[in-house]
């Protein structure tokens, strides 16, 4: 196989003082952090779609990249060439996982039969690539939003035949994910939403997508898939309003359809931005609700109202995110997938490495800082002290349902309660976090 990235052997850790742009400066896979290898904490994955499928087109311009596998020719042969380059990239980046949509790795074809045949061929190709490289599949998913048939959604489409086609894609992609040893399966409702309420039956569409998710869960149990099912929240784009708006909305949906024990969330930083939340908020919310699963690590631009999918570069933001994840016990089947793309002007093929190296170093440094926060214990101590009253006899009786409103009213009167506000010490805590980060 002819090498595509022929000027690079493999990206390696060379230390923070090294100036080699094709080396890691903070990501040392074998470094032990809180008793575990750094690589096992972070569980990095590179995505197929932005890295190997996007041609550099945007709303105002055509493809800007010259990728050999994106030229005209035999679609299946080009898909195999793309797989060659992808696994060369994964190996040279030293990333343990990858992620894909079905049509990222396989030509969709002109019919359902062609789609199924192509995907079967490419699943075997990927299996061979994984076996020879040691790279594993973090998660697979189905693209049920790009094709024109999905203009009005997939599971929420007014046409049950479109619903059925989407079900076929998800059925096939789930089976491929299982065959490839995928540790999760993701459901992102790219067009599960509406443009206008004038032609939308909200209750009908909610029932449709609820039933779709129930069928996904049923299929998981029928086939014995051991991975985690994940929904990826996003508030809008491409639709005006999407039903999986944010973590809290997804949790309400899961509760409605009895799926809160079956499906968790894959949280993307840029989607949190679009929903008007911080990335930290969405991670903490998912953990508090018991549905935290995995992360799409990227960043958005707060001055822009769309999904820019830039590589993460804020140690400050991600240190707090990793702090929450570590406190919750870390990833189980999930990981940090870089759902990010180089900028349209970044046309050098090695820009793909620069973007991922910077992101991996960012998350590695964030992990180290989060570990300092854990080991120091002062942030947790401050929070525990703030809520200490709820460990008292009064607090416990309230929480255990042993006191009614009337009981509390009597208690307050009998004890002549006159509580005073206690400082939240926000500035003190912010200063402490800055010292962890900057020393």
UniProtKB/Swiss-Prot annotation:
Cofactor: binding comment: Binds 2 magnesium ions per subunit.
Coiled-coil stretches: none
Keywords associated with the record: Carbohydrate metabolism, Cytoplasm, Isomerase, Magnesium, Metal-binding, Xylose metabolism
EC numbers for this chain: 5.3.1.5
UniProt xrefs under InterPro entries: Xyl_isomerase-like_sf, Xylose_isom_bac, Xylose_isomerase
First-listed, main subcellular location of the protein, grouped into a coarse class: cytoplasm
GO BP annotation list: D-xylose metabolic process
UniProt cofactor(s): Mg(2+)
Enzyme class of the recorded protein, top EC level: isomerase
One term under GO cellular component: cytoplasm
Binding, Mg(2+) 1: 232, 268, 296, 339
Subcellular location: Cytoplasm
Family of the protein in this entry: Belongs to the xylose isomerase family.
Subunit structure: Homotetramer.
Protein name: Xylose isomerase
Source organism (scientific name): Yersinia enterocolitica serotype O:8 / biotype 1B (strain NCTC 13174 / 8081)
High-level lineage: Bacteria, Pseudomonadati, Pseudomonadota, Gammaproteobacteria, Enterobacterales
Gene: xylA
């Amino acid at each position: 196989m002819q090498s595509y990235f022929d000027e690079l052997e493999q990206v390696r850790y060379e230390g923070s003082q090294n100036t080699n742009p094709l080396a890691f400066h903070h990501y040392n896979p074998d470094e032990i952090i809180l008793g575990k290898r750094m690589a096992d904490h972070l569980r990095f994955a590179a995505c197929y779609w932005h890295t190997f499928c996007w041609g550099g087109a945007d709303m105002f311009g055509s493809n800007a990249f010259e990728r050999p596998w994106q030229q005209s020719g035999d679609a299946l042969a080009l898909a195999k060439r793309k797989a060659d380059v992808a696994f060369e990239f994964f190996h040279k980046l030293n990333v343990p996982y990858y992620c894909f949509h079905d049509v990222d790795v396989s030509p969709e074809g002109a019919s359902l039969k062609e789609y199924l045949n192509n995907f079967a061929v490419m699943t075997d190709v990927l299996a061979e690539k994984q076996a020879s490289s040691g790279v594993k599949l973090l998660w697979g998913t189905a693209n049920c939003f790009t094709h024109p048939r999905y203009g009005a959604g997939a599971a929420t489409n007014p046409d049950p035949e479109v619903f059925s086609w989407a079900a076929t894609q998800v059925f096939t992609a789930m089976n491929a994910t299982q065959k490839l040893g995928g540790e999760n399966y993701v459901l992102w409702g790219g067009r599960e939403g509406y443009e206008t309420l004038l032609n939308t039956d909200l209750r009908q569409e909610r029932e449709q997508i609820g039933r779709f998710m129930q069928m996904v869960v049923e299929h998981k149990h029928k086939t014995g898939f051991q991975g985690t099912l994940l929904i990826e929240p996003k508030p809008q784009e491409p639709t005006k309003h999407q039903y999986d708006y944010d973590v809290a909305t997804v949790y309400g949906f899961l509760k409605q359809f009895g799926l809160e024990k079956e499906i968790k969330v894959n949280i993307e930083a840029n989607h949190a931005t679009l929903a008007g939340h911080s990335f930290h908020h969405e991670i903490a919310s998912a953990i508090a609700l018991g549905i935290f699963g995995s992360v799409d690590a990227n960043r958005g631009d707060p001055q822009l109202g769309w999904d820019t999918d830039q590589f993460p570069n804020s140690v400050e933001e991600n240190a707090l995110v990793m702090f929450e994840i570590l406190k919750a016990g870390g990833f189980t089947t999930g990981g940090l997938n870089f759902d990010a793309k180089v900028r349209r002007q970044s046309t050098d093929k090695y820009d793909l490495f620069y973007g991922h190296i910077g992101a991996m170093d960012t998350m590695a440094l964030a992990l180290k800082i989060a570990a300092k926060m854990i080991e120091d214990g002062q942030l947790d101590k401050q929070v525990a002290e703030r809520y200490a009253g709820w460990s008292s006899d009064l607090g416990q009786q309230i929480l255990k349902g042993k006191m009614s409103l009337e009981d509390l009213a009597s208690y307050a009167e009998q004890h002549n309660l006159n509580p005073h506000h206690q400082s939240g010490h926000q500035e003190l805590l912010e200063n402490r976090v800055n010292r962890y980060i900057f020393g």
